[in-house]
C-alpha cells in the first residue's frame, strides 16, 4: 500500500469518526460551516498546493451557474467543469498530481455541473407551469397539471456560499458518493438523521470494508499488477498463465474499489447523511422518488435506509449472471448522474449510448486504457444480448442453470480482460499485454458475434418457413372445406 493510500484511508477514518460529532451539532448553520471546514481540510491534506485546482474550477463553475441564464446554464457549466479537466490532466501529465486529488476533482466536476442541471430542470418546470396557468382553456382531462415545489423556486436563487458548502462538504469530498444538492439540503433541514440507525449501519459496512481490504492486501501481494509489466512475465510465463492473470489482477482492483467505496459510505452513514424513510422510495444518487416532506412530522415512527448513498451493490455485481446486469450495479450513483444529465438529454437517441460512455471515459481520464475498457463494454454487451436470446432466454431447469454459470464465467472474463486495459493504462503496456495473449478476447468475441449473426439468421429463416407452411396448410384446409361444401350442395 502506497503512502497516498495510507493518507487516504486515515482521512476516511477521520471523516467517519467526525460523523458522530457533526450529527449532534444542533445549529444547522454551524453544522454546515463545520462540514465545509472539514471538507476543505481534507482536500488540503490530501492535495497540498494542488488543491488550488479544486478552488479555481469551483470558482469558474459557480460563476457559470449563477451568471448564465438557466436556459443555457447547464450547458455552459458542463463545458466549464469538463473543460477544466483538460487543463487539470495536462498539468498532471507534466507535473504530476496525487491520484486522490484526481478523484476529488472528478467528484467536484459532477457536483457543480449537476447542480446546474438541477437548476435548469427546475426553471423549465417553472416556465411550463406558468405557461399552463396562462392557458385558461386547458383541458384538464387531456393534460395533467405540472407540479412545482419550493425546491424548484429556491434553486433559482442559489448563492455562491451554498454551492461552496455543497461542493466541499466533507461527506463525499474524497471519493463520493455523488449525491444531489437536494440530498445535501435535506441533511440540514430534515430530522431523518436523528432517527436513522447510523451506528448499526456504519458497523455493518465497516465489517465488509475490513473484509474487502484483507482480500485486496492478500491478492495484491500474490498477484501484483507490476508483475504484468515485467520482462519475466512475458518471457518466462506461458500463454495460459498470462491470459489467466487478468482474473486475479481485476479481482484485486475490485477489492480495492470496494474498500474505498464502502468506507466512503461509512462516512455518510455515521453522520446520518442520505437517510430517508422507506416510504419515500429512495434511489441511488437520486434520493426519494416519492413525496417525503410530510414524513418529518412523525419521523420517529419510520424505518430508514441509506440507499441514496450506496454507490456499488457489491453482492449483486459479484453474483449476477450477465455483464449487462453487472454494469447496472457498479458505481450506480455516477451512473445516475450520467443517465439523467447525458443519456436522457442527448439530442440523438441513436448515438446517446455512445455519447454517455464517451463522457464516462473522458471523466475517468485521458489515458488510452480508459477508452479501451469503457468503450469496449457496449460491444460485449451486444454480443451477450445476442447469445442470451439464442440460448439462455428459452432455457429452463438444469440447462438454464448450466447456461447461467457459463454466462457468469464469460462475464468475469470480459470484465477482467477489458479491465486489464484500464489498469495497464498506457497504449504501449496495453498493446504488449494483448499481443502476448494474441488478442484472444477481441478475436473470440468477433467470432462469437459472427456465429451469433449466422445462427440468428438461420433461426429467423426457419421461423419464416414454418410460418409459410402454416399459412399454406391453413389455405389448403380452406380449399378442401370449400370443395366439400360444393359437393354437399
UniProtKB/Swiss-Prot annotation:
EC number: 2.3.1.-, 2.3.1.23, 2.3.1.n6, 2.3.1.n7
Enzyme class: transferase
Pathway: Lipid metabolism; phospholipid metabolism
Gene Ontology molecular function terms on file: lysophospholipid acyltransferase activity
Superkingdom classification of source: Eukaryota
GO BP, one annotated term: phosphatidylinositol biosynthetic process
Compartments where found: Membrane
The entry's keywords: Acyltransferase, Membrane, Transferase, Transmembrane, Transmembrane helix
Transmembrane stretches, start-end: 2-22, 40-60, 75-95, 405-425, 433-453
Cellular component terms (Gene Ontology): membrane; mitochondria-associated endoplasmic reticulum membrane contact site
Active site: 331, 364
Database matches in InterPro entries: LPLAT_7/PORCN-like, MBOAT_fam
Membrane topology term: Multi-pass membrane protein
Reaction it catalyzes: a 1-acyl-sn-glycero-3-phospho-(1D-myo-inositol) + (5Z,8Z,11Z,14Z)-eicosatetraenoyl-CoA = a 1-acyl-2-(5Z,8Z,11Z,14Z-eicosatetraenoyl)-sn-glycero-3-phospho-(1D-myo-inositol) + CoA; a 1-acyl-sn-glycero-3-phosphocholine + an acyl-CoA = a 1,2-diacyl-sn-glycero-3-phosphocholine + CoA; (9Z)-hexadecenoyl-CoA + 1-hexadecanoyl-sn-glycero-3-phosphocholine = 1-hexadecanoyl-2-(9Z-hexadecenoyl)-sn-glycero-3-phosphocholine + CoA; a 1-acyl-sn-glycero-3-phospho-L-serine + an acyl-CoA = a 1,2-diacyl-sn-glycero-3-phospho-L-serine + CoA
Disulfide bonds: none
Family the UniProt entry places it in: Belongs to the membrane-bound acyltransferase family.
PANTHER family: LYSOPHOSPHOLIPID ACYLTRANSFERASE 7, PORCUPINE
Task of the protein: Acyltransferase that mediates the acylation of lysophospholipids to produce phospholipids (glycerophospholipids).
Name of the protein this chain belongs to: Membrane-bound acylglycerophosphatidylinositol O-acyltransferase frj
Amino acid at each position: 500500500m502506497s503512502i497516498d493510500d495510507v493518507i487516504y484511508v486515515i482521512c476516511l477514518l477521520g471523516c467517519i469518526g467526525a460523523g458522530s460529532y457533526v450529527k449532534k451539532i444542533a445549529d444547522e448553520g454551524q453544522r454546515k460551516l463545520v462540514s465545509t471546514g472539514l471538507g476543505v481540510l481534507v482536500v488540503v491534506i490530501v492535495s497540498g498546493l494542488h488543491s488550488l485546482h479544486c478552488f479555481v474550477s469551483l470558482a469558474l463553475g459557480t460563476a457559470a451557474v449563477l451568471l448564465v441564464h438557466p436556459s443555457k446554464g447547464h450547458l455552459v457549466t458542463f463545458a466549464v467543469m469538463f473543460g477544466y479537466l483538460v487543463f487539470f490532466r495536462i498539468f498532471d501529465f507534466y507535473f504530476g498530481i496525487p491520484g486522490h486529488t484526481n478523484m476529488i476533482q472528478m467528484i467536484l466536476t459532477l457536483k457543480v455541473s449537476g447542480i446546474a442541471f438541477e437548476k435548469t430542470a427546475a426553471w423549465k418546470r417553472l416556465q411550463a407551469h406558468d405557461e399552463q396557468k396562462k392557458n385558461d382553456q386547458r383541458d384538464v382531462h387531456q393534460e395533467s397539471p405540472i407540479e412545482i415545489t419550493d425546491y424548484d423556486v429556491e434553486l433559482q436563487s442559489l448563492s455562491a456560499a451554498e454551492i461552496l458548502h455543497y461542493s466541499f462538504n466533507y461527506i463525499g469530498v474524497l471519493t463520493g458518493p455523488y449525491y444531489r444538492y437536494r440530498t445535501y439540503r435535506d441533511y440540514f433541514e430534515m430530522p431523518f438523521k436523528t432517527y436513522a440507525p447510523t451506528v448499526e449501519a456504519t458497523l455493518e459496512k465497516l465489517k465488509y470494508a475490513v473484509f474487502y481490504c484483507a482480500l485486496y492486501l492478500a491478492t495484491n501481494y500474490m498477484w501484483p499488477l507490476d508483475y504484468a509489466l515485467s520482462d519475466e512475465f512475458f518471457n518466462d510465463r506461458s500463454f495460459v498463465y498470462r491470459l489467466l492473470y487478468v482474473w486475479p489482477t481485476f479481482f484485486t482492483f475490485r477489492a480495492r474499489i470496494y474498500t474505498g467505496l464502502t468506507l466512503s459510505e461509512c462516512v455518510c452513514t455515521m453522520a446520518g447523511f442520505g437517510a430517508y424513510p422507506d416510504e419515500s422510495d429512495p434511489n441511488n444518487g437520486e434520493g426519494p422518488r416519492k413525496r417525503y416532506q410530510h414524513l418529518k412530522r412523525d419521523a420517529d415512527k419510520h424505518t430508514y435506509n441509506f440507499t441514496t448513498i450506496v454507490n456499488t451493490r457489491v453482492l449483486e455485481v459479484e453474483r449476477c449472471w450477465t455483464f449487462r446486469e453487472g454494469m447496472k450495479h457498479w458505481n450506480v450513483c455516477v451512473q445516475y448522474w450520467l443517465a439523467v444529465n447525458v443519456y436522457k438529454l442527448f439530442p440523438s437517441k441513436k448515438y446517446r449510448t455512445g455519447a454517455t460512455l464517451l463522457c464516462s471515459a473522458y471523466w475517468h481520464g485521458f489515458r488510452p486504457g480508459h477508452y479501451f475498457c469503457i468503450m469496449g463494454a457496449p460491444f460485449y454487451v451486444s454480443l451477450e444480448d445476442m447469445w442470451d436470446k439464442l440460448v439462455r432466454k428459452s432455457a429452463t431447469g438444469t440447462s438454464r442453470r448450466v447456461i447461467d454459470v457459463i454466462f457468469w464465467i464469460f462475464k468475469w472474463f470480459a470484465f477482467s480482460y477489458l479491465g486489464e486495459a484500464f489498469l495497464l493504462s498506457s497504449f504501449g503496456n496495453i498493446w504488449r499485454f494483448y499481443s502476448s495473449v494474441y488478442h484472444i478476447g477481441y478475436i473470440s468475441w468477433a467470432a462469437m458475434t459472427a456465429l451469433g449473426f449466422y445462427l440468428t439468421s438461420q433461426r429467423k429463416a426457419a421461423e419464416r418457413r414454418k410460418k409459410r407452411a402454416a399459412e399454406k396448410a391453413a389455405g389448403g384446409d380452406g380449399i378442401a372445406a370449400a370443395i366439400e361444401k360444393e359437393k354437399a350442395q
